[in-house]
From Swiss-Prot:
NCBIfam families: reco
Job description of the protein: Involved in DNA repair and RecF pathway recombination.
Domain of life: Bacteria
Protein known as: DNA repair protein RecO
Entry GO CC: bacterial nucleoid
Keyword terms of this UniProt record: DNA damage, DNA recombination, DNA repair
Family: Belongs to the RecO family.
Gene name of the record: recO
Classification via PANTHER family: DNA REPAIR PROTEIN RECO (PTHR33991:SF1)
Matching Gene3D superfamilies: Nucleic acid-binding proteins, Recombination protein O, C-terminal domain
GO biological process: DNA recombination; double-strand break repair
Length: 265
């Protein structure tokens, strides 16, 4: 089969044999690709350092039966240098990479929107000009939008009655009107759903002006909504929570939301 080229974000890697690695890539035109990078663990490898997680690359690959083979790599953006040396950026970036892999769908299914979103998010994390908690929640909301899971924020998730509505229920799909409100719905403080809308829409002025209590509440809702749809917890999110020192009430509320909506689902 013919070689092909594609732009990719390196999501993760693991050892194979004495000198090789298997890398998981989120490519622009071929979606999720798993490939063998031969000899990259040797000190004389030409492109081993370019295949670290967080790297944005132009790769040439040879199609294989189960795994493709990386034959050439050109670095486009070296985000890792600015991310891995800062624990907060690192845990935030890891949560983004794990989410990207989980939402990419079947291997080789084109994912240009998710690829573009992930590159932009990693660039923002590496730049460090915006709060990492807001960047992560914005990424998760927009990634869910690409997957078709974004919560309803401006209308009722069940009957589409225009909002704003105060109640929120994950299994119902987001905000719900008084007539559709299921048992067990939560009522976020005023401004929380507005903050979620601002993050989804890219209104950074409004998002960065929100109080920390609202930001913490949003993080809980966003994580619970995503993990309800994934039907399992992201391994990296607890690390992010520890970095931001989420208070006990936020952690308990997040666990309650996930548990409650798993039963409803």
């Amino acid at each position: 089969m013919r070689l092909y080229r594609d732009r990719a974000v390196v999501l993760r890697q693991h050892k194979l044999g004495e000198a090789d690695r298997i890398v998981t890539l989120l490519t622009r035109d071929h979606g999720l690709v798993r490939a063998v990078a031969k000899g990259v663990r040797r000190t004389r490898s030409k492109f081993g350092s370019r295949l670290e997680p967080f790297a944005h690359i132009d790769a040439q690959l040879h199609p294989g039966r189960n795994l493709d083979i990386v034959t050439q790599v050109v670095s486009i953006d070296a985000f890792a240098a600015d991310i891995v040396n800062d624990y907060g950026r690192y845990t935030c970036g890891c949560a983004m990479l794990e989410t990207a892999e989980r939402l990419a769908g079947e291997e080789r299914a084109p994912a240009p929107a998710l690829h573009r979103l992930t590159v932009g998010a990693l660039r923002a994390v590496a730049d460090g000009s915006r709060p990492r908690d807001l960047l992560l929640d914005a990424y998760l909301l927009r990634a869910m939008g690409i997957a078709g899971w974004v919560p309803a924020l401006t209308e009722c998730a069940r009957c589409a009655t225009p909002g704003p509505h105060r109640a929120f229920h994950i299994a119902a799909g987001g905000s719900v009107c008084p007539h559709c409100r299921p048992a067990g719905s939560t009522t976020p403080p005023l401004g929380v759903l507005d903050l979620m809308s601002a993050l989804h829409d890219g209104d950074w002025e409004a998002a960065q002006g929100a109080p920390q209590s609202h930001r913490s509440y949003v993080s809980g809702l966003v994580a619970a909504h995503l993990q309800w749809h994934l039907e399992r917890q992201l391994k990296t999110l607890p690390l992010v929570e520890r970095f931001y020192q989420a208070d006990r009430s936020v952690a308990e509320r997040r666990a309650a939301l996930i548990g409650q909506d798993s039963e409803c689902g």
